[in-house]
Amino acid sequence: MSVTGFTITDEKVHLYHSIEKEKTVRHIGDLCSSHSVKKIQVGICLLLVELCERFTFFEVVCNMIPFCTIKLGYHNCQAAILNLCFIGTSILTPVFVRWLTDVYLGRNKLVYICLFLHFLGTALLSVVAFPLEDFYLGTYHAVNNIPKTEQHRLFYVALLTICLGIGGVRAIVCPLGAFGLQEYGSQKTMSFFNWFYWLMNLNATIVFLGISYIQHSQAWALVLLIPFMSMLMAVITLHMIYYNLIYQSEKRCSLLTGVGVLVSALKTCHPQYCHLGRDVTSQLDHAKEKNGGCYSELHVEDTTFFLTLLPLFIFQLLYRMCIMQIPSGYYLQTMNSNLNLDGFLLPIAVMNAISSLPLLILAPFLEYFSTCLFPSKRVGSFLSTCIIAGNLFAALSVMIAGFFEIHRKHFPAVEQPLSGKVLTVSSMPCFYLILQYVLLGVAETLVNPALSVISYRFVPSNVRGTSMNFLTLFNGFGCFTGALLVKLVYLISDGNWFPNTLNKGNLESFFFFLASLTLLNVLGFCSVSQRYCNLNHFNAQNIRGSNLEETLLLHEKSLKFYGSIQEFSSSIDLWETAL
């Protein structure tokens, strides 16, 4: 063969490779374009589902105390406890639903059940909350004459079914999935959670403004809008299921496994089991199979990491009790203040919108402080400082609420219409209470992102989802602890510290007591905060060989949907991740 033949063949080979390379590049471009469109579609659907779910949830929370006290005749203490229990149950049900999804039921089947329960609850709530007075639908005259006993039963059933429905939506459709963060360090993780909570509060602000309009309008808007929002949420969720747009998280060490390890360790450390194992360096080692337990070394070491976060979670219980004063003590204080603004009756939900403003304003500043002023090695100290400062702001808010409660009772009484009844309230303008709402908003701005980053980064990546579940669990326990505290204070003080008529009691004493507990909580957290300064401490320890998965997960950059795996660039924007 001639040299010319070799040259032509070589040119053909180069031409062939060029064509194949062009096809590959075009194919990759099409995949990237398709994935970008899918990401935008997922983000829009998630925001709409979150908006509908938050609207129904906050609609119940914002109207619970006025409805229970004015319509159902509950005492202030009973209404506050019921509201706190509803919030706590709504926080805990996603953890329960995730467990059902992983163990017993399929994801799609559970989503269908939860959507039905959510719509059933909103429909029942609308029937119960329908105005008790006569009303007209066109020329048709109707009367809502549901007996009080049946009304109370339907009300509890509606609240329970809404909680179960919310659990399914939050756990499966809108989970706190910080997927794609394994490749980032502490500073980028802080940026993610800053903007994640910024988006959540923007969503909440829109919801509160919408609820404010409903509270200002007639009651029929409530009857029609809550079931409508539930139906809209169901339609969007069904669309996401049909087009495989729901993120599917990986199954890791579960909460039940962690609890089981603790129980097994306590059982096998009994003297009669001590002879079964010698290789014991900690209490949890008793739960290992080689030491007489029934759990693998992998599960035991994962649980050990959770125990290091336990003091952090416990010290957040009292902080949560302060934050939960917005839907309990602060609501009662606002209801008994003058809501009349030049003839315009200000809706109570406006105060919630005001408490959301600090995060919307301060998030960019936190972003600057965490990324520009503090090097990566000092991010842990910065996060601990944020948590301490947030707790101090919460204590200051509750203390100021106590002073304003004393001040409020010195104003002359006026009559004010609320929920169809005329109440005798203080003439102190409700704008005096803005400061305490703002301070609690600042506390949430500082604590929530910092606490989430520590919970996420302080453990290996293979158990971070379970760590976030533990954080959710303690947030729910904080609501129930707050309800228990309200009940104990009511019983011990004979109703004086949480009175049914605020002008005849001393609600300020309850606020001062809560502020004192929060300050003690700050001192306790300061004593353990140093252990959370190094967010990558587990990398320096002699961790099991199976934790080589930690390194592999740092390079795993994929979003997993039903039946599909989409690759995405490591330069993904944090705003897109939050969406």
Swiss-Prot record:
A Pfam cross-reference name: PTR2
Family of the protein in this entry: Belongs to the major facilitator superfamily. Proton-dependent oligopeptide transporter (POT/PTR) (TC 2.A.17) family.
Gene that produces this protein: SLC15A5
Membrane topology: Multi-pass membrane protein
GO cellular component: membrane
Record lineage: Eukaryota, Metazoa, Chordata, Craniata, Vertebrata
Protein name: Solute carrier family 15 member 5
Transmembrane segments: 77-97, 110-130, 154-174, 191-211, 221-241, 304-324, 343-363, 386-406, 422-442, 472-492, 509-529
Biological role: Proton oligopeptide cotransporter.
GO molecular function: symporter activity; transmembrane transporter activity
Localization terms from the record: Membrane
GO biological process: peptide transport; protein transport; transmembrane transport
Entry keyword set: Membrane, Peptide transport, Protein transport, Symport, Transmembrane, Transmembrane helix, Transport
